[in-house]
Amino acid sequence: SETDILVVYVDGLQFGKYHVICAVGVDAGGHKHVLGFREGATENAEVATALLEDLTARGLSPFRRRLFVIDGSKALRKAIDQVFGKENPVQRCRNHKLRNVLGHLPKDQHDQAKSTIKAAFKLGADEGIAKLKQYASWLERDRPSAAASLLDGLDELFTINRLGLPSQLRRCLGTTNLIDNSHSAVRQRSARVKHWRDGTMALRWTAASFAASEQNFRRIMGHQHLWMLKAALDEFQQDQQLAQQIKAG
């Protein structure tokens, strides 16, 4: 494809007991593009890898540096390195992280956790990470599972901060809401479905609903700042190519 996809969102949707992984791209102009689907969960390494390999087979170059925005799946994270290389920046979904942490805390601690974590996300990467490590140390005493959840993949919660992107763009690139919002459209279209017969049925409904929704896609919030992301990705790719040339002699 000649479309310059800068961002790839990948997240899983659930229909009854069946799962579908979805990939949506954002080009340099902020326009969204449905890239592909695969039946299965993001936690399934084989399924995650197959989806990404299918994207490259259909024209998404594995040599262009991109920002990947994903849920917290370790299998999906590994698949990105395997298919597209370890040099691509990866942003873990902040909403997934927040929900996971809250799941380990009693309700009377939810407000404090939300305000602390969200405040840290507004800081520079190093300062924000330090704040959350400090909070995790406090949680460790009585809620070790919450502390462990918070610290898991902590650095990749701040990838967009390290890239120096403005807050308006970070709000869109910090979560997989872009896919979650499309999932709402899928749920609306499939509201009358009372029984999901199999994974193939879930996959077909997802593809049809996304295809219909794609016609009404709007550009992402903060799209006017995407040139900054493109510049950072291009610079990183040039530096890497230069390093490889020097190494090759």
Outline where the language-model segments fall.
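Amphipathic alpha-helical transducer elements in NTP-driven molecular machines
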Residues: 3, 42-49, 62, 70-77, ...
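Conserved phosphate-handling catalytic cores of large alpha/beta enzymes
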Residues: 98-127
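Acidic/histidine-rich catalytic cores and adjacent linkers
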Residues: 122-249
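Short, well-ordered secondary-structure micro-motifs
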Residues: 79-80, 105, 161-162
